[in-house]
Amino acid sequence: MRCPKCGATKSSVIDSRQAEEGNTIRRRRECDECQHRFTTYERVEERTLVVVKKDGTREQFSRDKIFNGIIRSAQKRPVSSDEINMVVNRIEQKLRGRNENEIQSEDIGSLVMEELAELDEITYVRFASVYRSFKDVSELESLLQQITQSSKKKKER
């Protein structure tokens, strides 16, 4: 592993541990030349997933797009980046579990909505308002009524 400070190719692993629910190995390294310490992450290389968008165009699947979309929806909400990361991990796992190389963008949006409904209702509504691109307020009101009813059912249990 090349040192980010001096560019030397020799480094020693100081610490190694599992991260992201065991899907990644986090290694703390020290450069043998300049003693600079840095962190690397190792994960299994997955097959490439292609997202088919509404207009028919295709692009490579990006965890970052999902993560950033959720981060925007969760602004000023009590949702940690670790929680969001776990949501993104679950979504990616579900998508890869399908054994399909191409995934519809609507399927990804639906999975995000399912996860956010469990995580935080306000984040869910914010994401839904962009994802579903409501035509008028009545569509948003309908969604809010659904959420209110499901919240009442959860509390009754």
From Swiss-Prot:
PROSITE patterns linked to this entry: ATP_CONE
Top-level lineage group: Bacteria
Keyword DNA repair among record annotations: no
Cofactor: record remark: Binds 1 zinc ion.
Ranges of residues in domain ATP-cone: 49-139
Stretch list, region Disordered: 1-22
Cofactor: Zn(2+)
Family annotation (InterPro entries): ATP-cone_dom, NrdR-like_N, RNR_NrdR-like
Alphabetical UniProt keywords: ATP-binding, DNA-binding, Metal-binding, Nucleotide-binding, Repressor, Transcription, Transcription regulation, Zinc, Zinc-finger
HAMAP family: NrdR
Family per similarity comment: Belongs to the NrdR family.
UniProt cross-references to PANTHER family, sorted A to Z: TRANSCRIPTIONAL REPRESSOR NRDR
Protein name as catalogued: Transcriptional repressor NrdR
